[in-house]
Amino acid sequence: MNTEEKLNQYVLHSYGRYPMAAVRGEGSRLWDSTGKCYLDFCAGIATCVLGHCHPAVTQALQKQAATLVHCSNLYQIPQQADLAEFIVTKCVERP
């Protein structure tokens, strides 16, 4: 089965897909399996706003993956507390 056939067979059809299989990304560009380059206007629903494979994001992900990939919310997670503090103090207006 090719990628499109597998997606049709095994993945929930929540929305229509463009008939292109992205195999690599760099910055705002994506490449398909034939080597054709596309400008990515979707940016992973804003999850890739810095572009695909941004060096700083890649380095941070590699560092975190080497430390701890996932931890249950049953435990205290220092990074979660730090991020929550940062978001609240920067984004929430206090009376």
Identify the residue ranges that each predicted region occupies.
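Active-site-adjacent loop/helix segments that line or gate small-molecule/cofactor pockets in enzymes
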Residues: 1-26, 80, 86
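Compositionally biased, intrinsically disordered low-complexity regions
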Residues: 18, 27-29, 46, 53
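Short, flexible segments with low predicted structural confidence
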Residues: 1-2, 32-33, 58-59
